[in-house]
Regions:
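Glycine-rich phosphate-binding loop signature in dinucleotide/nucleotide-binding domains
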Residues: 78-85
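Short glycine-/acidic-enriched loop or helix-start segments at secondary-structure transitions
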Residues: 15-16, 46-47, 67, 97-99, ...
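Short histidine/acidic/glycine/proline-rich micro-motifs that form metal-
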Residues: 10-12, 62, 118-121
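N-terminal subdomain of nucleotide-sugar transferases
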Residues: 1-44, 49-54, 107-109
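An aromatic- and histidine-rich active-site surface loop
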Residues: 71-72, 85-109, 115-123
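Alpha-helical scaffold elements within enzyme catalytic domains, especially in hydrolases
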Residues: 26-27, 78, 103
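A short, charged, and often flexible helix/loop element on the N-terminal side
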Residues: 50-77, 89-91
């Protein structure tokens, strides 16, 4: 299967989401799947592949409430135009999920959304 994993940060960035997605991506590759990770462009990442996982960087930041900056349209085009079988987005309230919200109906692949907390919901901006 062709699988796209979307997360705000990925290796060499360090954190819980990054580790979960890295483990998932690499284990899917070992099982014979073609895995791409869509993530934030980092100046410390000097590779486009890691342990069989293709990394596609996007210069995007923010979310729907605070506003998104960067190449949001490029990210949407990438996700909606590639023949992925499954797309998994880890975490909400960040650009890899929020940028796809208006384009969900254009994504033909199966979609899996895994929220790992809604830590910003107490903020007044999320009340509307």
């Amino acid at each position: 299967m062709r699988i796209l994993l979307c997360c705000e940060f990925y290796s060499p960035s360090v954190g819980g989401v990054q580790e979960v997605m890295k483990q998932l991506a690499e284990r899917l590759v070992v099982r014979g799947h073609e895995v791409t990770v869509a993530t934030t462009e980092l100046p410390t990442r000097f590779f486009g592949q890691l342990n069989g996982v293709t990394i596609r960087e996007f210069k995007v930041s923010g979310n729907l409430v605070r506003g998104m900056e960067g190449k949001v349209a490029e990210y949407r085009r990438f996700v909606t135009s590639q023949p992925f079988d499954v797309i998994m987005v880890k975490a909400a309230q960040q650009w890899t999920f929020d940028a796809l919200w208006p384009a969900l109906s254009k994504i033909k692949a199966g979609k899996v959304f895994v929220p790992c907390g809604f830590s910003g919901l107490y903020e007044p901006a999320y009340a509307e």
